[in-house]
Amino acid sequence: LLSKKIEVFVNIMQISEIEEKAIKKICFFLQPVKIKALYIADSLGSLNNKSFLKVANKFKKFWSGELGLHAHDNLRLALSNSLLATKSGFKWIDSTISGMGRGPGNLKTEEIIKYYNLKDIKFVRLLKKKYFDRLKKHYKWGTNKYYKFAARQKIHPTYIQEMLSDKRYGKKNYSSIANSLKESETTK
């Protein structure tokens, strides 16, 4: 890909679960590849600001190239973690209109635009209203108390997404199912 003048980004998932030894190996392996940036993804959406900085500093310790962040919004911390990333030297932050993404969603474009007081906010709000609000209602992305619970327990959001979309269960079952997921995660 690089020989075809295609810029390559590598996304490392579930960064909240990676130990420093593995981070060092990943960075050492990728260093000679000349990728555009090494992206880290908070796949479980479980990183608070302090834990994000701890993980980010581990990557910065071993990676000399550009860094990027893909923040999930389970705990409603995608914006604050993204702002911390930029303040600590990350060059790349991604976002989606209305936080569009599987399950709890991602950093919302309109939040980052509003924070930086950019002129594009009216256009993004128009797109959101015209297209994305309807899509969000149909596909039901966005965080809720079950995604927040999963993030705190380090349960992958796919389990919650499956639970919420399974017609066999109703709201009265969700808490007991989420708690059983917690129990099965702690027995691993």
Where are these regions (language model features)?
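Catalytic cores and adjacent flexible loops of soluble metabolic enzymes
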Residues: 1-188
